Amino acid sequence: MLSNFLKVNSKALGHIRTFASKSGEIKHNFKKADTYLCDGPSDSTVTNKDELISFFTEMSRFRRLETVCDGLYKKKLIRGFCHLYTGQEAVCAGLESAITKDDHIITAYRDHTYMLSRGATPEEIFAELLMKETGCSKGKGGSMHMFTKNFYGGNGIVGAQCPLGAGIAFAQKYNKTGNVCLAMYGDGAANQGQLFEAFNMASLWKLPVIFICENNKYGMGTSQKRSTAGHDFYTRGHYVAGLKVDGMDVFAVKEAGKYAAEWCRAGNGPIILEMDTYRYVGHSMSDPGITYRTREEVNHVRQTRDPIENIRQIILDNKIATEDQLAAIEETVRDEMEKASEKAIAAPLPQARELFTNVYLQEVPVRGVEFVNSFKP
């Protein structure tokens, strides 16, 4: 978890705490969210040195995690599907800061950073990607099927996680927990019929679910302009309120997330958040990402809207830290991820008997299973 990371690496951050203690509160303005059937949050917030350093560190960890994944895949140590989150870090960091660990998240196949934000260790994530027994799913889930407490994956079927998210929210309402569920999906899933069915049932039963469309502009290699008749995804719930948010500004995401969580906890039912974001990489590792868009387009977003660079600039402008101090944080993050990947590479593969675990909750009476049972622990 980030809190533990900051404690362990207090040496690298110590000078920053001392230097920044004089700066106090900092007001940050961002693009106001477009609204539909609701008022929406403010277009400004007050932050401080601790939150700024925390966001910078966490998003740096997200990006370095995915950079290491990219390298492991190219070395053919990671096999199969692998979808990276590079460029979209502000969405994950901002939403996580807007809710509690008792709240729930379910997403699609770009799930590595959500595992990290929910409390999994980098080693558990890398080990799962490498199909090792120390992985978070014991090597059986791979890139798309990672799970930890109050995080339900990683789902490989486009849009299928949204009805599940409504179901998780139904459980919260039924059990009167007061918690909410974030159901993440991309613009490529925004036309799936099951999504609209989930909108309907969630609205009918006023379920505490926040449907979050991470609009990174491309569903695989198809631009949203070529696949969707209506581009305002935050209005497509018809009777469900919605917001369109600058998904590259972590504070805009945080404030929208807080507004949405309060909306749901107040018993208003579901709400849709459309995150205007961008992925720098291809759809998956098998996609170079430049056959359907130009390098100039990608570089323009990197240079003008990068979420980590935006935070870096706020920190420098307000004299929270120096370039050297931020570089020290990044170096610590690199070391953390490299060491975690080395441990994951060295970890053993799962035993054959692991194939037969976690299949049924209770023993199932089946004849002729002596051979299979011989592999069980």
Swiss-Prot record:
GO terms for biological process: pyruvate decarboxylation to acetyl-CoA. One of its GO terms (molecular function) is metal ion binding. Mg(2+) binds at residues 187, 216, 218. Gene3D superfamilies: 3.40.50.970. Its cofactor is thiamine diphosphate; Mg(2+). Pyruvate binds at residues 83, 109-110, 156, 158, 187-189, 216, 218. It is an enzyme of class 1 (oxidoreductase). Thiamine diphosphate binds at residues 109-110, 156, 158, 187-189, 216, 283. It is found in: Mitochondrion matrix. Keywords: Magnesium, Metal-binding, Mitochondrion, Oxidoreductase, Pyruvate, Thiamine pyrophosphate, Transit peptide. The pyruvate dehydrogenase complex catalyzes the overall conversion of pyruvate to acetyl-CoA and CO(2). It contains multiple copies of three enzymatic components: pyruvate dehydrogenase (E1), dihydrolipoamide acetyltransferase (E2) and lipoamide dehydrogenase (E3). Tetramer of 2 alpha and 2 beta subunits. This is Pyruvate dehydrogenase E1 component subunit alpha, mitochondrial. The gene is pdhA.
